[in-house]
Amino acid sequence: MIIRAAKEEDLAKVIEIEKLSFPTAWDHDFLEKISKDIFLVFNGQEVCGYLIAGCCHENIVATILKVAVHPEHRRKGIATNLVHKLLEILKDRKITEIDVIVIDECEPAILFYKKAGFKTVSTIPQASNNDLYEMKLTIG
């Protein structure tokens, strides 16, 4: 399994996985603008998953924006490998904390992040019936 930063030519595959994974997919133009923050995982020559993250708060905190794995490659540790690789990169950059926002109805994502060591630090009430959970992990 190879993990590397995305390139322009990878965006079509990212969009394909995006559309298979989320009811409201981000479009090509937006993904192109943030492509430096996309990490891909390959199985041979095939892109089978991605993680999008960004840094904020004077580059001491990072945020996971999205993680998605192609349906044919799910439950194989790909998302876990992407998060572990991101943590290595962030540690090298002296980033001390990473957070993620997860909707309360997405129990698999909540369990995934808890297994990775994230802790729920707050609940963000929404006008809809679904609340958001802010989860954080201290790095290093």
Regions picked out by a protein language model, each given a short descriptive name:
Residues 3-4, 117-121:
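Short secondary-structure junctions
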Residues 1-9, 137-140:
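Conserved N-terminal entry element of GNAT/NAT acetyltransferase domains
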Residues 39, 96, 103-110, 115-116, ...:
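C-terminal "cap" of GNAT-fold acetyltransferases
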Residues 67-84, 93, 103-111, 115-116:
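Conserved glycine-rich acetyl-CoA-binding loop
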Residues 8-72, 83-85, 89:
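Acetyl-CoA-dependent GNAT
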Residues 61, 97-99:
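Structural preference for beta-strand elements that scaffold enzyme active sites
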